[in-house]
């Protein structure tokens, strides 16, 4: 009688459900996964080493390209680490702007997650709905930085510039009719704060639409309930953070447990799951988007009532204003020194962790007193989640693999660095 052997299958790195360049070597018994061996490193670009050869300010652009779905959240941890090293005070208005954009980025991340997860499991409509909403937030990115993704907007000491008083307008093109452009421009007639007031109301309706499509959908629940279950205790042992940890019922969120910026002044809840399966992780992320929407509204109200500076007045670290630089020799010298040499930080080491959309994103900097880091290390939340892939997939069907990979919400820009 012939001997039965398990079958080995390469899943990725070019599979559309691999979410980047994930390569999984799956050992299958029929259609059941016996073992999963994740291979990482295919998107390694040497970001940490590159940053060690550039002045601090010139590495902000690298941060956007780590997790390229949560751009400003990467910048946030990096500039906070530099500020901690320099013991630099940040203006209150800049803190609120940072928090507001961090929450916008959280929504951008979770919308892409629900879109990709939906399309992996056959829910095409959600993909289209989510991308329609993301356009509004990309317009906000573009308004403050000129870039729709890699903004480099956060700076040590604050943000690059204040919020604009006029939003970008859509123009008639061969793809956009005059009538459609006029409709799109209706909420864009005022300032960014006016636009965001309009957005937070509309976004609740958009979330309700996605909720209606998925939350009680029989097929969606069959694909996600009791799939990829992780207990609270095991999630902590595996080093899970973010929605992966909260989906297992652990109320750990750095914005509450170790508050930074102005989170201690804002009101929001920490959504948690009960069973730790794919469905709970979906519910947690949906609830997080509603909480982020509340935080954006609170920031908009505060920013409207409190004008002020958005960048530190320490010109050893933050550039002087352009008109001052062109009329004053001292400011010109500061500007020249800052952009040619950068600034030196005191000797020492710091670690800053922030509540990234995917979990705890940490930046460790060791300084030897030079104008560039002696050592830069990033803690990517996705690395711990990918490491648990064998445990998450074992015992499930091959068809459950895309659902589990999706709910991990992994991006290889930060995993491989």
Curated annotation (Swiss-Prot):
Assembly and binders: NDH-1 is composed of 14 different subunits. Subunits NuoB, C, D, E, F, and G constitute the peripheral sector of the complex.
Broad class of the protein's primary localization: membrane
One Gene Ontology cellular component annotation held by this UniProt entry: plasma membrane
An annotated Gene Ontology molecular function: quinone binding
Function, as annotated: NDH-1 shuttles electrons from NADH, via FMN and iron-sulfur (Fe-S) centers, to quinones in the respiratory chain. The immediate electron acceptor for the enzyme in this species is believed to be ubiquinone. Couples the redox reaction to proton translocation (for every two electrons transferred, four hydrogen ions are translocated across the cytoplasmic membrane), and thus conserves the redox energy in a proton gradient.
Topology of this chain in the membrane: Peripheral membrane protein
Keyword Transferase: no
Keyword hit for Translocase: yes
Alphabetically ordered keywords of this record: Cell inner membrane, Cell membrane, Membrane, NAD, Quinone, Translocase, Transport, Ubiquinone
EC number: 7.1.1.-
Family of this protein: Belongs to the complex I 49 kDa subunit family.
Subcellular location, record wording: Cell inner membrane
Protein's gene: nuoD
Name of this chain's protein: NADH-quinone oxidoreductase subunit D
Species whose genome carries this gene: Francisella tularensis subsp. novicida (strain U112)
Reactions catalysed, as given in the entry: a quinone + NADH + 5 H(+)(in) = a quinol + NAD(+) + 4 H(+)(out)
Leading EC class: translocase
Source species, domain of life: Bacteria
């Amino acid at each position: 009688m012939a001997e039965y052997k398990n079958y080995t299958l390469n899943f990725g790195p070019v599979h559309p459900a691999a979410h980047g360049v994930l390569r999984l070597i799956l050992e299958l018994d029929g259609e059941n996964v016996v073992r999963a061996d994740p291979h990482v490193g295919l998107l390694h670009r040497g970001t940490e080493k590159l940053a060690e050869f550039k002045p601090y300010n010139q590495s902000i652009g690298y941060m956007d390209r780590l997790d390229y779905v949560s751009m400003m959240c990467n910048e946030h941890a990096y500039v906070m680490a530099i500020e901690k090293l320099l013991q630099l005070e940040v203006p209150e208005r800049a803190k609120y702007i940072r928090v507001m954009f961090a929450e916008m980025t959280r929504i951008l991340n979770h919308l892409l997650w629900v879109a990709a997860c939906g399309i992996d499991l056959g829910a095409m409509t959600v993909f289209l709905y989510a991308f329609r909403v993301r356009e509004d937030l990309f317009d906000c990115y573009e308004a403050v930085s000129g870039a729709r993704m890699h903004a480099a907007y956060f700076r040590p000491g604050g943000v690059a510039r204040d919020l604009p008083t006029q939003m970008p307008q859509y123009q008639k093109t061969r793809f956009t009719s005059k009538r459609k452009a006029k409709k799109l421009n209706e909420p864009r007639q005022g300032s960014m704060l006016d636009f965001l007031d309009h957005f937070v109301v509309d976004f609740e309706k958009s979330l309700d639409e996605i909720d209606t499509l998925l939350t009680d959908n029989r097929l969606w629940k069959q694909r996600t309930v009791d799939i990829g279950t992780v207990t609270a205790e095991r999630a902590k042992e595996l080093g899970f953070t973010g929605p992966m940890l909260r989906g297992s019922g652990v109320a750990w969120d750095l914005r509450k447990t170790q508050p930074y910026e102005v989170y201690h002044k804002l009101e929001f809840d920490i959504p948690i799951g009960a069973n730790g399966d794919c469905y709970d992780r979906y519910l947690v992320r949906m609830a997080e988007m509603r909480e982020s929407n509340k935080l954006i509204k609170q920031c908009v109200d505060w920013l409207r009532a409190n004008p002020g500076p958005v960048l530190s007045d320490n010109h050893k670290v933050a550039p002087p204003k352009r008109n001052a630089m062109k009329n004053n020799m001292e400011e010109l010298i500061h500007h020249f020194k800052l952009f040619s040499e950068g600034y030196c930080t005191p000797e020492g080491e710091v670690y800053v962790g922030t509540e990234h959309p995917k979990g705890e994103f940490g930046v460790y900097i060791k300084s030897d007193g030079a104008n560039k880091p002696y050592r830069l290390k990033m803690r990517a939340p996705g690395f711990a989640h990918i490491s648990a892939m064998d445990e998450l997939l074992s015992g499930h069907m091959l068809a459950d693999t895309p659902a589990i990979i999706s709910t991990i919400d992994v991006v290889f820009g930060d995993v491989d660095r």
